[in-house]
């Protein structure tokens, strides 16, 4: 069985996008893992699936699978690519759409030259909303790591869980060691995305993210939102900031009590057809 797909990326955070409105397929965990293999498959950070919505006032259903085959609630870079994909594939003529995710409704809006602005919804901070295990709510939490190390973290849910820590320099931060420990820490029962943020000034941060189920990626849209919101609510950042990631830059805006806005680019890489029998054999 041949499936048409599109390879896209948002700041190097790369995706395979499948239209499962015009075509049909069943993809189990093993199949997705094989597709994600960068040597024997296509290779991607996440698989994005376009499906019909479950509700009449929504345009599309958006499903996201990590490279390890796990389904997740949200992907910020992915939703920008999703919006461009459905418009260019003529699945909709709208430039502003409502998209159903496991975390709720997001509203991307197409701009010029492949840029997309997205209403990412309201950030959540309560421990049970992350979820994060703690005896009481605090502004910052101490997370114990191996070898008697610890990190001061903030926790934010942007449709998916994030732990944010401030570092002096993202280039020298030991993301490879600390990232996996934070991601799978026992206090995060659903695992977590680990963000390492350097504050350059009140309108500019640098960020590295070790993503749950993927590892460190070149960019993470929800991670950029979580880091910016964390700094803003602590009075360390202005209400609009530029987030510099390895793959490029995002603009994040937020006012206390309001939704988070993310603006950034998208790119089409190539289109192709995959033989599903190869990945399921």
Curated annotation (Swiss-Prot):
Substrate binds at residues 13, 46, 66, 76-77, 160, 193, 211-212, 221-222. One of its GO terms (biological process) is lysine biosynthetic process via diaminopimelate. The record marks 162, 211 as: Could be important to modulate the pK values of the two catalytic cysteine residues. Pathway: Amino-acid biosynthesis; L-lysine biosynthesis via DAP pathway; DL-2,6-diaminopimelate from LL-2,6-diaminopimelate: step 1/1. Signal peptide: none annotated. Catalyzes the stereoinversion of LL-2,6-diaminopimelate (L,L-DAP) to meso-diaminopimelate (meso-DAP), a precursor of L-lysine and an essential component of the bacterial peptidoglycan. This is Diaminopimelate epimerase. The gene is dapF.
């Amino acid at each position: 069985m041949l499936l048409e797909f599109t390879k896209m990326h948002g700041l190097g955070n790369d995706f395979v996008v499948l239209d499962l409105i015009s075509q049909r397929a069943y993809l189990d965990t093993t199949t997705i893992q094989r597709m994600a293999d960068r040597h024997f498959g296509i290779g991607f950070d996440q698989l994005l699936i376009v499906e019909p919505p479950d509700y009449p006032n929504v345009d599309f259903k958006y499903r996201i699978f990590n490279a390890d085959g796990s389904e997740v609630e949200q992907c910020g870079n992915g939703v920008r690519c999703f919006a461009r994909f459905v418009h260019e594939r003529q699945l909709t003529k709208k430039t502003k759409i409502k998209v159903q995710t496991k975390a709720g409704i997001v509203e991307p809006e197409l701009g010029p030259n492949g840029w997309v602005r997205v209403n990412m919804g309201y950030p959540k901070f309560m421990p049970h909303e992350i979820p994060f295990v703690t005896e009481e709510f605090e502004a910052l939490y101490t997370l114990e790591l191996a070898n008697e190390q610890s990190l001061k973290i903030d926790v934010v849910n942007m449709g998916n869980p994030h732990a944010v820590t401030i570092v002096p320099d993202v280039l020298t931060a030991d993301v490879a060691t600390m990232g996996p420990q934070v991601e799978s820490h026992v206090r995060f029962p659903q695992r977590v995305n680990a963000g390492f943020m350097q504050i350059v000034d009140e309108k500019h941060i640098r960020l590295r993210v070790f993503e749950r189920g993927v590892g460190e990626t070149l960019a993470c849209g929800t991670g950029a939102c979580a880091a910016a919101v964390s700094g803003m609510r602590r009075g360390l950042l202005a209400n609009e900031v530029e987030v510099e990631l390895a793959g490029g830059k995002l603009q994040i805006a937020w006012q206390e009590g309001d939704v988070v806005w993310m603006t950034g680019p998208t790119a089409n890489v190539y289109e192709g057809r995959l033989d599903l029998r190869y990945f399921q054999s």
